């Protein structure tokens, strides 16, 4: 027996064909699959910050150049003013500057009545007059208080800017005086359009405990007014506080002893009969 006598069927193998068309059918790859989005955002922020810093630096340089130019112009103007002054005026200015400097040094010993850099300084002026003038100028330099009108908010008034308990009490007393005057001028408008609603609005921000205190205070006022009204009513009606409102005074009773009168009359009649009448 030999291997040649055996028949073997060798399976045919099909060679896998590779073509460019198969490559075209592959899924498309991302162009930048390894790019980090956070890195891109960070670089973008850095670029924006850099541009902003460059812009700020450029703006600052421009401002510095502008200030330098203005300073040069100012220096040139002062220099021209000095050049135009004649020699006599120059000497006078130097003398005045020296006197001013000496007076300032001496004024340090007398309460700081300095005169430096004052073009209106008069060498012959008395120090007291100058102090009064400086005080008046300082007072005039203060900002004037705003003029209050009907449209001005109440907060502009100094009274409505309290900072401590004493100032709050001062505000309360001022308001009470003004409100009482309004109530006397127009009681109807005061009660219907101001008083009642004002009490409600003023009590709105208070706590529950404070609102109860307000109610207790109002109850005391109610009792006082009821008592005063009752006394006024009694006084008008001519009564007394214990007799009731409008009750007239009781008239004294006239005593008539009827039984005594009849007794007296009966006795008189019996006295008129004689003994002969019964005979």
UniProtKB/Swiss-Prot annotation:
Residues 20-39, 268-279 have a biased composition (Acidic residues). Its main location: cytoplasm. Keywords: Coiled coil, Cytoplasm, Initiation factor, Protein biosynthesis. It comes from Meyerozyma guilliermondii (strain ATCC 6260 / CBS 566 / DSM 6381 / JCM 1539 / NBRC 10279 / NRRL Y-324). Component of the eukaryotic translation initiation factor 3 (eIF-3) complex, which is involved in protein synthesis of a specialized repertoire of mRNAs and, together with other initiation factors, stimulates binding of mRNA and methionyl-tRNAi to the 40S ribosome. The eIF-3 complex specifically targets and initiates translation of a subset of mRNAs involved in cell proliferation. Gene3D superfamilies: Eukaryotic translation initiation factor 3 like domains. It comes from the Eukaryota. It is found in: Cytoplasm. Belongs to the eIF-3 subunit J family. Transmembrane segments: none annotated. Component of the eukaryotic translation initiation factor 3 (eIF-3) complex. Residues 34-74 form a coiled coil. One of its GO terms (cellular component) is eukaryotic 43S preinitiation complex. This is Eukaryotic translation initiation factor 3 subunit J. One of its GO terms (molecular function) is translation initiation factor activity. GO terms for biological process: formation of cytoplasmic translation initiation complex. Residues 40-67 have a biased composition (Basic and acidic residues). Residues 1-74, 229-279 are annotated as: Disordered. The gene is HCR1.
């Amino acid at each position: 027996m030999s291997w040649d006598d055996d028949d073997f069927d060798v399976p045919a193998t099909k060679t896998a064909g590779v073509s460019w068309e198969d490559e075209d059918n592959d899924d498309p790859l991302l162009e930048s699959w390894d790019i980090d989005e956070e890195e891109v955002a960070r670089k973008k922020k850095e670029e924006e910050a850099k541009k902003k810093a460059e812009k700020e630096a450029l703006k600052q340089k421009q401002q510095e150049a502008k200030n330098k130019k203005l300073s040069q112009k100012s220096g040139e103007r002062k220099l021209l003013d000095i050049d135009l002054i004649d020699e006599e005026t120059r000497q006078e200015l130097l003398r005045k500057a020296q006197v001013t400097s000496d007076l300032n040094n001496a004024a340090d010993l007398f309460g700081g009545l300095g005169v430096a850099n004052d073009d209106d300084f008069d060498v012959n002026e008395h120090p007291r007059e100058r102090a009064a003038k400086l005080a008046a100028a300082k007072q005039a330099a203060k900002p004037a208080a705003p003029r209050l009108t009907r449209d001005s908010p109440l907060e502009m008034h100094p009274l409505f800017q309290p900072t401590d308990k004493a100032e709050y009490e001062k505000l309360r007393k001022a308001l009470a005086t003004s409100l009482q005057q309004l109530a006397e001028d127009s009681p109807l408008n005061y009660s219907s359009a101001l008083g009642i609603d004002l009490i409600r609005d003023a009590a709105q921000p208070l706590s529950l405990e404070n609102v109860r205190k307000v109610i207790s205070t109002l109850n005391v006022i109610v009792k006082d007014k009821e008592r005063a009204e009752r006394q006024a009513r009694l006084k008008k009606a001519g009564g007394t506080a214990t007799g009731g409102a409008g009750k007239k005074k009781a008239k004294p009773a006239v005593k008539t002893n009827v039984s005594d009168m009849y007794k007296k009359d009966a006795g008189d009649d019996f006295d008129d009969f004689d003994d002969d009448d019964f005979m």
